[in-house]
Amino acid sequence: MSSKPRRLPWLALIAAATALGAALARASGTPAVAQWDLFELTLPGPAAGNPFVDVQLSATFTHGARTVAVNGFYDGDGTYRIRFMPDETGAWRYATASNAPALAGRTGTVDVTPPGPGDHGPVRVHDTYHFAYADGTPYHELGTTCYSWIHRPEALQEETLRTLAASPFNKLRMCVFPQGHNVRLMPPPLFPFAGTPPQDWDFTRFNPAFFRHLEQRVGQLRDLGIECDLILFHPYDDGLWGFDRMPAAADDRYLRYIVARLAAYRNIWWSLANEFDFMRAKTDADWDRFFQIVQHDDPYGHLRSIHNGARLYNNSLPWVTHASIQNGAAVEDPGRAELYRDVWHKPVVYDEVKYEGSPDAPRWGDLTAPELVHRFWCGTVAGTYVGHSEFFTDQAGAVWLGEGGTLRGESPPRLAFLRRILEAGPPELDPIDQWQDTDMGGVSGEYYLLYFGREAPASWTFRLPVGRQPWWPRTLPYGRLVDGMEFQVDVIDTWAMTITPVPGVFITKQKGRYAFADRDGRAVALPARPWLALRIRRVGGAEPAPGAGGN
């Protein structure tokens, strides 16, 4: 399910180097932290008045010619913290600044050792449409959504973590603020602000216990290798607490506080909102401002997106790193899924394509498992990414989408199967020819995934599209196929989770202007049922055409 086994010898060396570096740092009395881990500086300071608004605290961390500025925060009881995620090994010097004399002018050094096993750093945008960890390791996004799991009873939260640990998912979408859904059965134990529920809040004073609990869960996801796509606002308050309609100053203060607390966690992604357009008290100018606050205050440049309801945000804006889309129809076939890539030239993540659930569930939660898996495959061969959740109500009234707990659907094992296929393939898949052969993605001349979807073919005549053509008046990217290349074909049953190699190899011969066939005209026999795919990999013969650009 992961590519880790291919790197085990290196992991052992990294672990040894990390342990040695930490030991040397301890011997010198200098604090040590691994690259991309979290260094925390704790300082005592003033507790009188309202430190959340009265005290400003920051620090600069310097490594050679580089300087990184980070904001600190008040954690209650006269305690202040500054958190830092170093992205380079070596000695980093720091110096604090504050309007409180007790916090200003603190200096020191932290030794940054090589990253620990499995730590590849934060996820970044890579090659325009895709993602990779900071060290270059490919990241094949496979996410699920569980909005309010951190606001449910402790036992249910622990069950959710166990479920995630055994799941194929490497990203979790979750909310900061509680939802109104199911609140009578499972009332939130903590709230983000000082005050008394339901609506007697002091928006100038945060509740540190709430945020410590949030951080604990974010850290546990990190330790499981799961990215946390943190939803900062949502419209599901249902008029209970008013967190969806705070005044502008409270919104801005909240964003700066949560970024100061959480930006040093390498697995954080910022989702500005879920169904942003359903929050009637906010304008597009508000969302633009929120993005800019997060972008400015996060020194590490974590991924930033915003999820839509009925209306799309302008994802072309520079502070949006990738598109987070709700659109189930877009992934009913690969040709539709690809279109958003051409609009924004950014990664496209269909975080909500409807959910697997019971037939009597609301229309957004009534997909069958085969249909949800089908949408994942359509999005995959289109060079995009797709998200999961489920809406089965159990006897206690808990659903994975809202509360977490256990997964009951049939899609997760099939998504684990898809993840294994992706991680055994090239780092990224792109459409081969999105104008004509929309059901095929891959790397031209090397690797292809052909997905038949609902069709039930009895055979497939070997045929690979040339790809996009050089053409007057401008040269477009074109494919890398030539005569004499040798390919192996595997038949994939995406539902039965089987891979069946086809005997022999297929040798390419150009057939017309736009495609290559097998030189002997061979075809692949298929079992005439839906949900089939083909994996086509180059195994020898002629080399791909040199100098060809893209797919």
Where are the regions that the model predicts?
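Bacterial N-terminal signal peptides that target proteins for export
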Residues: 2-12
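Bacterial N-terminal signal peptides
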Residues: 11-22
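Non-catalytic, glycine-rich low-complexity segments
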Residues: 28-65, 70-73, 109-115, 436-441
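Aromatic- and carboxylate-lined catalytic core of secreted/periplasmic carbohydrate-active enzymes
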Residues: 29-32, 50-51, 137, 356-359, ...
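Extended acidic/polar, glycine-enriched regions
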Residues: 68-128
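Exposed aromatic-hydrophobic patches
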Residues: 81-85, 476-478, 511-525
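Active-site mouth of glycoside hydrolases
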Residues: 120-333
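Extracellular glycoside hydrolase catalytic/binding regions
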Residues: 253, 274-413
